[in-house]
Amino acid sequence: MMEKRQPELCPGSPDAESGPGKREDAAIISRQNGCKEDEESKREEGDKEGGGRFKGDEETDDVPLQNSSNGTSISIIINGVTKETASHNALDLKREVPVIELSRRDAIKAVEQRTESHLVPITELRRPPQLPLPPQQRDDARMVQLSPNAFPVPARAMLYNLAQPLAAINSLGGESEQYSMYPSNRVKRRPAPYEVELDEAKIVRRIFTNSRERWRQQNVNGAFAELRKLIPTHPPDKKLSKNEILRLAMKYISFLSNLLEDQDGGRNVSSTTDGETGLMVGAHEVGPQGGPHQDRVVGLARDDIMETMSPGSSCGSLPDGDADGSPESFMEDQDSPPAPRTLTASRGPPLHLTTRDLRRNGRPLDGSSRR
């Protein structure tokens, strides 16, 4: 017959204070932790093997022998083997276990919050958030908004007087009548400068006309350059305008024609007229002995021509009225010539001079001449 072993307890120990209530709590704890099921299974196996054991042994299997406030150690005799099981107080478990778990969770959460609070600003400083890409279907609206608005929309409408483009711009914004200044039925559509339609035939015709005019101008300039080379001037490289070139060419041609007529030397010497001075030199019928008089008259005409071709002459510098080189002024001078005066001389033929030539020359042609 097996006896239960009970250790001696000190009177001041917390185990000695435990009573029947404590034992019942320990039994409840052992059932909750699954210890009771293990003990019952082992006890049934021991009953089958031992068979002749006493009932007192079976009754004393579940009796706790030692209890404590913090934990109870239970000595159980199963098949002659003493087994000790430890169980905590139910109140202590209810108080300690949830508190420990909650404290752990709170501590973990607090640590995570601290780390997040420290990491979030650093992450924002190092890695700024990316801007979202604009949608592709609103490209037209963005282009209208990005266009520079130097004037407000009503001012631009007054400046350009474009009603349809203004309505198109307002339709994009969704407020078509906010900037409408005039009703659409009164405004007439006017083409903008960039909307001028150019026909291909017009372009080709314009190009052909420009090229033809350029070619004509080049030919005219070339002809004037060739004519300028034939006109003798005192500075050979003197620059002359087109009007001056034409006037000098006419005078030079008339001088050469008169010179050729004088060199023929007939009995009836026709009167020669200078183109510039209007000097008309007439001769009576003279024979071959009249050569000195003819040479003197030709010499005077040559001197007058050279004077007109000099830089200080009126031909080199045109009058104020003829600065533009208009042909009307030249035709007026040729159409209405002044009446010439006749100067008689005792020696030589009569001389016909105009009033303008008398004022310009201011000197007598011969010492014995009289007015």
From Swiss-Prot:
GO cellular component: nucleus
UniProt-listed SUPFAM superfamilies: HLH, helix-loop-helix DNA-binding domain (SSF47459)
Amino acid composition bias (Acidic residues), ranges on this chain: 321-335
Superkingdom in the source lineage: Eukaryota
Entry-linked InterPro entries: bHLH_dom, HLH_DNA-bd_sf, TAL-like
Keyword entries, A-Z: Developmental protein, Differentiation, DNA-binding, Nucleus, Transcription, Transcription regulation
UniProt main location, coarse: nucleus
Regions of compositional bias (Basic and acidic residues) in chain numbering: 34-57, 293-305
Tissue-wise expression: Expressed in the main hemopoietic organs in adults, namely the kidney and the spleen. Also expressed in the liver, brain, gill and gonads.
Disordered, as annotated region: 1-71, 263-371
Short name of one Pfam family: HLH
GO biological process, one term: artery morphogenesis
GO molecular function, one term: DNA binding
Residue stretches making up the bHLH domain: 204-256
Function of the protein: Transcription factor that plays a pivotal role in hemopoietic and endothelial development.
Protein's name in the database: T-cell acute lymphocytic leukemia protein 1
Organism in which the protein naturally occurs: Takifugu rubripes
